[in-house]
Amino acid sequence: MNLILFGPPGAGKGTQAQFLVETYGIPQISTGDMLRAAVKAGTPLGVKAQEIMIQGGLVSDDIVLGIVAERLAQDDCAAGFVLDGFPRTIPQADALSVILKQVGRAIDHVISLEVDGEEIVNRLSGRRSCSSCGKGYHLVFDPPLRAGVCDVCGSGLVQRADDQEETVRNRLLVYEQQTAPLKDYYRSRQVLCSIPGIGSIVEIQQRIAAALVE
């Protein structure tokens, strides 16, 4: 089963990706992981990517797509894969389709976890962690016994810069601008599965599993 997984920050995408990996026995593949693996392995494309990244540049689509093609040709992808964070643009989606078509494959389903923006803001902006031991909390769902103080070591709690409300809203805006055209693209190809991302982890897993057998 060849899958793509979309989801805004804070939607629980990592948890659901792991569910797909364990349920269907297919690897989760992210662009970042692929680039790092290619660089570490010293492949020709990995060497090119490393040179660009060292100079602070953006790795071109040609290199990224080459690395994607190499990764999808590996033995562990024989039964399928879960692409996470790729494609990011319509040209990348078109190129991915060509890569797969060349080996007689296609994207079977695109899973899009749908969570209201305000819910995401509440989830992420409420997160706190201990400045000393790193234990995580949430002001609403998992608060400390004493406000602002770690239950374990008594140190102060801090909020990550990424979890500040303004930052979260900006990340959501970027996500929507980036994925809205892709969702339309895959909807027109009748492979988009929009999954409500509100509920327990198990409930969301059940929705995904049901969508994949339709």
From Swiss-Prot:
Q: Where does Zn(2+) bind?
A: C130, C133, C150, C153
Name the residues that bind AMP. Answer: T31, R36, G57, L58, V59, G85, F86, P87, R88, Q92, R160, R171
For this protein, the parts annotated as crossing the membrane are none
Q: What Gene Ontology biological process does one annotation of this record name?
A: AMP salvage
Q: Quick one: where's region LID?
A: 126-163
Q: Is the keyword Heme assigned to this protein?
A: no
Q: What class of enzyme is it?
A: transferase
- State the superkingdom: Bacteria
| Entry's Gene Ontology cellular component terms | cytoplasm
Reply yes or no: does the keyword ATP-binding apply: yes
Per the UniProt entry, the Enzyme Commission number(s) are 2.7.4.3
Entry's localization field:
Cytoplasm
Functional pathway: Purine metabolism; AMP biosynthesis via salvage pathway; AMP from ADP: step 1/1
Gene3D superfamilies in UniProt = P-loop containing nucleotide triphosphate hydrolases
- Reactions catalysed, as given in the entry: AMP + ATP = 2 ADP
Q: Which GO terms describe its molecular function?
A: adenylate kinase activity; ATP binding; zinc ion binding
* Pfam (any one): ADK_lid
Recorded hits in PROSITE patterns, A to Z, give:
ADENYLATE_KINASE (PS00113)
| Chain positions covered by the region annotation NMP | 30-59
UniProt family annotation: Belongs to the adenylate kinase family.
Q: Which HAMAP family match?
A: Adenylate_kinase_Adk
* Role of this protein: Catalyzes the reversible transfer of the terminal phosphate group between ATP and AMP. Plays an important role in cellular energy homeostasis and in adenine nucleotide metabolism.
Question: Assembly and partners?
Answer: Monomer.
Q: Domain annotation text?
A: Consists of three domains, a large central CORE domain and two small peripheral domains, NMPbind and LID, which undergo movements during catalysis. The LID domain closes over the site of phosphoryl transfer upon ATP binding. Assembling and dissambling the active center during each catalytic cycle provides an effective means to prevent ATP hydrolysis. Some bacteria have evolved a zinc-coordinating structure that stabilizes the LID domain.
Name of the protein described by the UniProt record: Adenylate kinase
Gene of origin?
adk
